[in-house]
Swiss-Prot record:
InterPro entries given in the database record: KOW, Rib_uL2_dom2, Ribosomal_uL24, Ribosomal_uL24_CS, Ribosomal_uL24_KOW, Translation_prot_SH3-like_sf
Subunit structure: Part of the 50S ribosomal subunit.
GO process terms (BP): translation
Gene transcribed to yield this protein: rplX
Lineage: superkingdom: Bacteria
Family matches, as NCBIfam families: rplX_bact (TIGR01079)
SMART domains membership: KOW
Pfam families per UniProt: KOW (PF00467), ribosomal_L24 (PF17136)
GO cellular component, one term: ribosome
CDD domains: KOW_RPL26
Protein name per the record: Large ribosomal subunit protein uL24
Gene source species: Saccharophagus degradans (strain 2-40 / ATCC 43961 / DSM 17024)
Length: 105
């Protein structure tokens, strides 16, 4: 089970975008994440009329290392760590380490 999943709200803890918050759009296989509004790059796009793509300079989100972000805890308004807890029925859930509240409600 992954500590950070799609649609989690995360905060960048190191790097040029330190302090920015965003939602995880995609989790890549090599411990990298695509987070909305974070790690914006400019890509020089070549036009492709067959696919209907206009050329020019476009801005898009680049992957960011998962170790450079932390999950955002709305109860404390701070970055938090993720722990796991077994429920009585045998399911494993993610919890915030600071207050023990479940992330997946």
């Amino acid at each position: 089970m992954r500590k950070i999943k799609r649609n989690d709200e995360v905060i960048v803890i190191t790097g040029k975008d330190k302090g920015k918050r965003g939602k995880v759009n995609r989790v890549l296989s090599d411990d990298r994440l695509i987070v909305s509004g974070v790690q914006i790059i400019k890509k020089h796009q070549k036009p492709n009329p067959q696919m209907g793509i206009a050329g020019g300079i476009i801005e898009k989100e680049a992957p960011i290392q998962a170790s450079n972000v932390a999950i955002f805890n709305p109860a404390t308004n701070k970055a938090d760590r993720v722990g796991f807890k077994l429920q009585e029925d045998g399911n494993k859930i993610r919890v915030f380490k600071s207050n023990g509240e479940a992330i997946d409600a």
